[in-house]
Amino acid sequence: MSSAILLRIHDFSGGDVFSAFFVCVEVDMDALAFILLLLEAGLALLLLYFDGLLKKPAHVLVCAGLVALAFAVRALFFGCETLDYQDFLSRWVQHFRENGGFAALSGSVGNYNVPYLYFLALFSYLGTDDLYLIKLLSTLFDVLLAFGAMRLAGLFTRSRVRLLFVYFAVLFWPTVVLNSAVWGQCDSIYVSLALLALYWGMSGKPALGMAAMACSFAFKLQAVFIMPVFVLLLIAKRVKLWHFLIFPAVYMLLMLPAILAGRPVLDTITLYFDQMGSVGSALNYNSPSIFAFARDVSDEALAAKLGTAAAFTLMFAVFAWFWWRRSSITNWALLGGALILVVGIPFLLPHMHDRYFYAADILSLAFAVAAPAYFFLPLLCEFASLLGYHAYLKMRYLLLMHWGAAALAFVLIVALVFTAAQLHPVRRQKYS
């Protein structure tokens, strides 16, 4: 079974929009890839059904149409190859193919952590185009991402319309589509798991939450922007100290297949330290962080240290604030605190990349659905992130990145004010 779709996207000047950092080629999806895509779409619909959101045939028809459209849009971009795919991901899969598949886990392959490499090793056994399989993995977690955002928002509203809105908003959110279907990146994996971790942590299932957080961290180091929320949950007595033992246990369990394949234990568990050493020396990599304002910095090493110190200061200040007001902590306060940390930590850190605000994009969207008066927050986050995506994919700036940084600074201020209102209530406003 083969269905060919030739993709050409043009801008108003007549040139190819994505001509710089990736090439769109003919999409020739074989039977396996097509079936997997259909299964993912079916899963997206089933999750809504089992969550009790499809009560009438009309609901099923409308949601089925939206799911079909979401996956059709993704399929159109499956033929796009970025330099990340050409120079790294495709070569890693080929390495597994040429060195015994899972047996090649015994050595060092790429700089992603091993849980993601398990999937690449699996793909080396299949006859389907590696590009499609990599993107299908990411789009599978797009579904889990939408589900996690919906569940998190569901702690604050029971409105079926609003829950369906956040579900489909995530599936159609520009950075979500670009990240998985165009770029072939895996940010949806760690963020979907992190959102579920927050949901379980805030809804009385701390063990599940900690396990999900460990899985998130096992896939991507950037989960550290979200992990501090569990300290807030500890302060709020939603988790206990012993629950933190689940984190290393689950993490080591995920490392075990690679270790059993012969990969050295120390190399396996310290991979992230190697990643931090290779992050690069530039203060900013197309990120809407505070360093987007930096111009002609004379001592970049000092600036990097100051940024790191500022990020840690913010984090510990939030911890102290919540400890001081621990008797006033509600789910609303935790949601505000989570947004402060997820936006503020990467905003202040040096060496941030274009995709590092992906979690902020989605958490702010769930926040806005929970509290519709703050509808502008995800729009500002998305604006900031898209500037970075455009800079990478087009190799030129649509606007200078400091405009995105200004947008995120405003989001951070609003999150601080919102959280202050929750922790120091005169009369708590009802947002839902």
Predicted regions: what is each one?
Residues 31-87, 172-174, 248-263, 343:
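Transmembrane signal-anchor helices characteristic of membrane glycosylation enzymes that use polyprenol
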